[in-house]
Swiss-Prot record:
It catalyses: GTP + H2O = GDP + phosphate + H(+). Belongs to the TRAFAC class translation factor GTPase superfamily. Classic translation factor GTPase family. EF-Tu/EF-1A subfamily. This is Elongation factor Tu. The keyword Nucleotide-binding applies. Residues 10-207 form the tr-type G domain. PANTHER family: ELONGATION FACTOR TU, MITOCHONDRIAL, ELONGATION FACTOR TU-RELATED. Keywords: Cytoplasm, Elongation factor, GTP-binding, Hydrolase, Magnesium, Metal-binding, Nucleotide-binding, Protein biosynthesis. GTP hydrolase that promotes the GTP-dependent binding of aminoacyl-tRNA to the A-site of ribosomes during protein biosynthesis. Residues 174-176 are annotated as: G5. GTP binds at residues 19-26, 81-85, 136-139. The keyword Amino-acid biosynthesis does not apply. GO terms for molecular function: GTP binding; GTPase activity; guanosine tetraphosphate binding; translation elongation factor activity. Residues 136-139 are annotated as: G4.
Length: 398
């Protein structure tokens, strides 16, 4: 069967759910697809199909990142359901990087929890510009004052991490009611319609970096029998067209290849634009020649490097960071785009150690070369937790 062409008439935005485990992120994602399907005819995705990695069902927590799509009156949304469990922050970092705006889901029963804070912090680190709040499970809260208290706590938390907490839009509702087609006290379907309207009005259409040379971090690699190797990811900048020559950069020798096909949501495209999640079919490339964490680029635009200078913020103990200082030779993991890689830190001449809560310049040497450039942001991780965030200020010749 021939694949349908992708409809470009509506403005395209990337959003996603963030928040504490079991506060209802996946239920809300399913409710958004259901209400949008009823109103605008897009595909309805049941809860089970979004919460779809096998180990999730046993423990009731979302591990992998699910992509769904839905529409509002004026926009087309690609929605990432981000993992909520602290153990899966690594996925959160790659997921949250794909958002023009985030929907923070917080249970009205429990209020903000440790991962609520951690996800807001991560959203700030990876540059999510806008957060909309969905105060879920409001049908289980009879005391209006309690709702107001939770709302106030969330606003204070957002302000603490440099979001505009006072003016953040907060929708009070119940995703489960909406999923069951109920609307008690306008907390069900009505709250989802309101959320769609608020997404439309409050998530700014980003200036897609279309004029810059093409770059796409590789998230996943598949072999398609009889066709070749497909890599998937979100185009960070530029435009890619079938027939164009590109390079695969990072970890190994740079490889040149030709794009022979582009797809989005199982529909074929002639070209892919910045901001879109696509699959790209590559000519004469074997599955084992490509891996997650490499990038596709317009030929000759980026060289791989291992050394750089960066400005970093090291989280304080209170923010969930390290409890002790680190010294020259510290070797944490650096998370760039879709890859994590160990790096060795050197300190400026006048600094002997870095304390939790410090803002400092570091000179870093990565253990393998990857595609990096000035302005690239990253997270610093150690022992399963985020300990810092940074931005590259200068790439050094190796």
């Amino acid at each position: 069967m021939a694949k349908k062409k992708f409809n470009r008439e509506k403005i395209h935005l990337n959003v996603g759910t963030i928040g504490h485990v079991d506060h209802g992120k996946t239920t809300l994602t399913a409710a958004l697809t259901k209400v949008s399907s009823d109103l605008y005819g897009s595909e309805c995705r049941p809860f089970d199909s979004i919460d779809n990695a096998p180990e999730e069902r046993e423990r009731g927590i979302t591990i992998s990142t699910s992509h769904v799509e839905y529409e509002s009156e004026t926009k087309h949304y690609a929605h990432v359901d981000c993992p909520g469990h602290a153990d899966y922050i690594k996925n959160m970092i790659t997921g949250a990087a794909q958002m023009d705006g985030a929907i923070l889901v917080c249970s009205a029963v429990d209020g903000p929890m440790p991962q609520t804070r951690e996800h807001i912090l991560l959203a700030r680190q990876v540059g999510v510009p806008t957060i909309i709040v969905y105060l879920n499970k409001a049908d289980c809260v009879k005391d209006k004052e309690l709702l107001e208290l939770v709302e106030m706590e969330i606003r204070e938390l957002l302000t603490e991490y440099d979001f505009d907490g006072n003016n953040t839009k907060i929708i009070i509702g119940s995703a489960l009611l909406a999923l069951e087609n109920k609307d008690d006290n306008q907390l069900g379907t009505s709250s989802i319609i309101k959320l769609l309207e608020i997404l439309d009005k409050n998530i700014p259409v980003p200036n897609r970096i279309i004029d810059k040379p093409f770059l796409m971090p590789i998230e996943d690699v598949f072999s398609i029998s009889g066709r070749g190797t497909v890599v998937t990811g979100k185009i960070e900048r530029g435009i890619i067209k079938t027939g164009e020559e590109i390079e695969i950069v990072g970890f190994k020798e740079t490889i040149k290849t030709i794009v022979i096909g582009i797809e989005m949501f199982k529909k074929t495209l002639d070209e892919g634009f910045a901001g879109e999640n696509v699959g790209i079919l590559l000519r004469s490339i074997k599955r084992e020649e490509v891996e997650r964490g490499q990038v596709l680029i317009k030929s000759g635009t980026i060289k791989p490097h291992t050394n750089f200078i960066c400005e970093v913020y090291i989280l304080s103990k209170e923010e969930g960071g390290r409890h002790t200082p680190f010294f020259k030779g510290y070797k944490p993991q650096f998370y760039f785009r879709t890859t994590d890689i160990t790096g060795i830190c050197d300190l400026p001449k006048n600094i002997e150690m870095v304390m939790p809560g410090d803002n400092v310049k570091l000179i870093v040497k990565l253990l393998s070369s990857i595609a990096i450039e000035k302005g690239l942001r990253f997270a610093i991780r150690e022992g399963g937790k985020t300990v810092g965030a940074g931005i590259i200020t200068e790439v050094l010749n190796d």
